[in-house]
Structure formats: structure tokens, C-alpha cells
Amino acid sequence: MSTPKPDRRTFVKWGIASAGVPLVADALGALAEAKAEPPAAATDVSDGGERGGSTVSLGSGVQLYYKEDWLGAPWLNGEPAILLHGNLETHEIWYGWVPRMAQQFRVLRPDLPGFGRSTAPRDFEWSLGNYAKLVANFLDAIGIASAHIIGAKTGGAIAMQFAATYPQRTRALVVASGPFTSVAPGTDDNSQQVRLGSAATKEEMAYFDKLRDETSAETRRGVGTMMSNFNLESLLPRIGAPTLVITSDRSKLQSVDTVLRYQPKIPHSRLLVVTSDAYHVAVANANECVTNVLAFIRETKQA
């Protein structure tokens, strides 16, 4: 039986198009029912236009900067959601997600080590496994046992590595344009028009150019080498959390057919294909992504 082509509103489950089919019940095996943890003490940071940022020490010289947002009732504390950005950028790329996500979740957006205001470990061995370990260390540092893990681009690959390595710490997984295998060296040096799509404004592209230019040469080399030499295929069956994979129908990072070769290997996964010529869908199609992510997580909790 041939695999049907999904449209922008179609979820694909195990490679078979199925619009809105609930996740199977055992998909919730890795979704721990736990109370939201209170935030741990951290150092407040006030710098530039950012307010309310904090840093935590992860050892080995790592000072990790992160932003935390909760816009729900002040007497409540939402379930934690960790948002992991991609290469050549910072936590700021999630600006389109915070207003709605933070009404329902305690949203934590770290600058991954080596990016933004976070330092990389001394003598860091650049690998997805080491980045996943640093994310786990971050959760430990702020007192979080498990969280919804959401990643974009390189952050999506790190998120998959984390979910496979720490299944009991992953409530749900969202991968927005995250590659499953090596990408060509220099892929993230593509023009912002390619990354953000034809609808991107000059001001938006200039801003992302600024984030790229502010990334250190050491980080660019390290992450570039890491992303041109990895393969997550053998780890995908180990991901136990309900998973939503998001891509675009005209992505220049990886085609829908390429995604369909790997996404079904994640046991409890769905694929959402949005109509876009950008491959950074977390930014270019933020509103549609958030709408579907909120619905997806809500469904997994109700199943």
C-alpha cells in the first residue's frame, strides 16, 4: 500500500495518514503524573532588553542562562516545558510561542551551552549525547524531575537524543524541523530567506543574521562538526514519550519523504506537515505550531 501524502492539517502515524486519530493508550506509559515542581533558586540577570532571566551553574565552567515564563493563575504552577533552540540562535527565537504556551505551561527557554549568554564546558566534546546530558543537568539544577521537551532544528535533534536517553524525564516530545541524520556542513549558514521562508521581513532576517554573527567561532565549528556527523535512527525506537514531529511541505532541510523514513520509527509519534517554504517552522509558522502542540499535549493527557 502506498503511503499517502499528508496535507497541512494531516497527522501521520506510523507512516499512515490519519487525521486526528488519538494516540494509543500505551503511549502514556512514559507520561508521568507528577505535580509541577517549584522553581529552584538561581541568579537573576538584568541585561539589555531581557528581564527576569536567570543563570545556574552546571559545573565544568558552564553558566547556563535561561528565561522562565508562567502566565497562568499566580497561585498555580504549570507543568514544565523546556524549549531548545537551534544552531546560530538563542532562547529568543521562541518569542512567538511564549504568550500562549505560558498560559498553560511553565515555559523554560535556555540558551544552550555555547550560545547567547551560556558558556560551553571546558574542553567540551561536541555531541548530541553531551548536549542531552547538559539539558538533564539543567533540569536537576532547577529541581525538575520531568518535562515536556520541545526542540527546533539542532534543538530538535538534541530533544530526540534526550528523550531516548532519559525516557522517564520526558513527558511529551515535540520536534520542529529537527534532522534525524547528518546535515551538510554549512547548512545553517544558508540565507535567512531559506531558513525563515519567503514571508520573512528584512528586519526579521537582519535580526537572525545578528544572532548568527554573535555565535562564537568555536561554537560554530563544534556544532557544525557535530551536526555533520550523527545518526539518530538506532535511538528512535527507544523514545517512549508521545511525540509530535513537525516539518514543512517545502523544507530545504529535509523533504517530507525523508522525514517519513524516520518518524515512524518513533513508536508513538505523529507527523504534522505545515504549508511553508521555510525550514525553521518554529519561527516561520509559530502560531500554527503552538496551536497543534497545545492540542497534542492536551490529547495525550486525556487519552
Locations of regions flagged by a protein language model:
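Conserved hydrolase catalytic core segment
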Residues: 145-183
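Short beta-strand/loop motif that positions the catalytic acidic residue
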Residues: 239, 245-247
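C-terminal segment of N-terminal export signals and the immediately downstream linker at the start
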Residues: 5, 26-59
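N-terminal secretory signal peptides and thylakoid transit peptides that target proteins
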Residues: 2-19
